């Protein structure tokens, strides 16, 4: 999970929205849960209430069977092994689906520069418009800082 001090989390997303983002399906038993909301993504062994995880490697089937995630993106071969109460989001490519979902929860920041009031930036420094400079940082003369850098 990204550090929320640096990355803003979007959402929550409903099950219907998650299915659309990931191009995933659910078993008929969960069709009535399309309005259920999810707040984040997390690894199998760390996921909890309101969170979605994924299984893409049979090495982690044990963690999948024990997960406390609210839902889990899985290949159809593993869907029937989901723990009771865990929604199996069925995808032929669960890792790719999880990546899409993580991008939805943690979208790229819009390219707006943020420089803390306590930061010192030399007049000759060149900062990309997407750079963020935190409290008490010092950017010296002639320094060039590229896109999406957080200091």
What are these regions (language model features)?
Residues 1-118:
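Terminal amphipathic alpha-helical/low-complexity segments used for targeting or macromolecular assembly
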Residues 54, 114-151:
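Structural signal for interior beta-strand "rungs" in well-ordered beta-sheet cores
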């Amino acid at each position: 999970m990204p550090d929320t001090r640096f990355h803003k989390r979007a959402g929550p997303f409903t099950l219907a929205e998650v299915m659309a983002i990931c191009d995933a399906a659910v078993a008929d038993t969960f069709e009535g849960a399309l309005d259920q909301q999810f707040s984040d993504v997390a690894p199998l062994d760390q996921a909890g209430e309101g969170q979605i995880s994924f299984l893409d490697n049979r090495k982690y089937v044990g963690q999948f069977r024990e997960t406390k995630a609210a839902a889990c993106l899985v290949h159809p071969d593993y869907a029937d092994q989901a723990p009771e109460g865990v929604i199996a989001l069925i995808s032929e490519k669960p890792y790719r689906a999880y990546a899409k979902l993580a991008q939805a929860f943690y979208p790229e920041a819009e390219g707006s520069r943020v420089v803390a009031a306590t930061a010192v930036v030399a007049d000759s420094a060149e900062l990309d418009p997407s750079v963020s400079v935190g409290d008490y940082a010092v950017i010296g003369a002639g320094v060039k800082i590229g896109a999406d850098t957080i200091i």
